[in-house]
């Protein structure tokens, strides 16, 4: 598989300007300092419900996520990244605050991502590199679901106890992980 030439940040739902929200803009700036590497962080359509039927086509046609793309997905964005990788080849997934169910939340249920079983084997077949960041003190996601994602995808898991839902403004570890992917196999 060809070396990656870009990263795409797929944000969590909730709206707000992606470029200025949380760590997204900070990571974008850091990754764009890598020569010949591009990082996209665009505002997503349908930002509140984050419907699969809207987000996945946008990832394909507007963000051009392909086999040379590292998809960095946060929360709902991590879920979109996993569903996308069920049917598309991508270079890598970097999943931040990933989970496996609608958590009994009406908005999550309406998104459509949880209407069928996960195709874990297809994700692994389409994506040779999977890294996950999770925190045991996430106020929205039970650790059990985060751990299930790591186990099912054989992800390289960075487990924290003090990062909550990763809503901080900087994310040094994520930049290091992407840089290590550019240097070759982990």
From Swiss-Prot:
Entry's EC annotation: 3.1.-.-
Gene: Rbbp9
Stated induction or repression of this protein's expression: Following chronic low dose of ionizing radiation, expression is up-regulated in male spleen and down-regulated in female spleen (at protein level).
Similarity annotation: Belongs to the RBBP9 family.
GO cellular component, one term: nucleoplasm
GO MF, one example: serine hydrolase activity
Known function: Serine hydrolase. Catalyzes the hydrolytic activation of amino acid ester of the antiviral prodrug valacyclovir to its corresponding active drug, acyclovir. May negatively regulate basal or autocrine TGF-beta signaling by suppressing SMAD2-SMAD3 phosphorylation. May play a role in the transformation process due to its capacity to confer resistance to the growth-inhibitory effects of TGF-beta through interaction with RB1 and the subsequent displacement of E2F1.
Catalytic function, reaction form: valacyclovir + H2O = acyclovir + L-valine + H(+)
Keywords assigned: Hydrolase
A Pfam family of this chain: Ser_hydrolase
Oligomeric and partner information: Interacts with RB1; the interaction disrupts RB1 binding to E2F1. Interacts with RBL1 and RBL2.
Tissues where the protein occurs: Expressed in spleen.
Residues at the catalytic site: 75, 138, 165
Region: Involved in binding to RB1, residue numbers: 63-67
PANTHER family: SERINE HYDROLASE RBBP9
GO annotation (BP), single: type II pneumocyte differentiation
Stated name of the protein: Serine hydrolase RBBP9
Gene3D superfamilies: alpha/beta hydrolase
Region listing for Retinoblastoma protein binding, in residue ranges: 56-70
